[in-house]
């Protein structure tokens, strides 16, 4: 009974989807431990709770990027959902082919969005938000980014002047 109450919105949404003929959804992600867990454990739990099967393809990162770009260029997606690194947010935003998640959750996806979902519970939404201030995906897994640069080159006045002349 606890499970039923806890997952009420998933169960209710699943019933509506099943009434529309949805029996399976397909998603793709790169092959890393986090996504292997999602594929093996969370997909199974989702099916047990909702009755909707999740087909979760695990492929190499480069293949995810290639398939995603092909889908954006063609306007046809072979997957219902994509789990991609947050550093692709710029690509999602620039192509203009991805519906921002924040727009979807507030608009036509509102009936499918768990009313208990609080985006403040997620760490890293700044990494999955584009320059238009819209959220394009929920942060799934994050890793520290470290950028190296040569301070001696940045300190050179001649290079600073060239940069300023070119870029303002």
For each feature predicted by the language model, list its residue ranges:
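Conserved N-terminal structural module of periplasmic/extracytoplasmic solute-binding proteins
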Residues: 3-97, 108-117, 158-167
